Amino acid sequence: MKSLESGLVRLFQLRIQNIVAKLKEGDKAPDFTVRDGEGQTVRLKDLRGKKVVLYFYPKDDTPGCTKEACSFRDSFAKFKQRGIEVLGVSFDSEAKHKKFAQKFDLPFRLLADTDRSIAESFGTYGEKKFMGRTYMGIHRMTFLIDEKGKIKKIFNQVKPEEHAEEVLAAFDE
């Protein structure tokens, strides 16, 4: 079972390699206004002067997405120490985000991109293929945004359990 799971994960990762985000490192990050799981308005422009991790994930409370969120949770003190704001983005509603954050004690904000506008502007929404099925969805990607609002790094391939430490290392480069 584990080798089947590993094979499926690798197949999915290979598919991700073929995604070309329309944004590049060094580009200005697109601004957005959206609500988080607590119903609070979040504007990217209001975070200028801070480093931001904007991580896109497919769905709350699913195995890979939970591992990734818990990875950020477990490393959150390190992000906070460095003054880095962590924001998760999916198509889930504010209510689902609130429930997910409470269930796993997530200390960062989850953004409800219910109209897909953020994912589309960052190039993370598109065709996906998994287990012989083709569908449209959000690709697991992460953007590191510097204090001036520029994209410092884009992660097109993400290992959910290790991702937070990988992101921290990239900010330290």
Residue spans of the language-model regions?
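Chalcogenol-based redox active-site neighborhoods
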Residues: 4-173
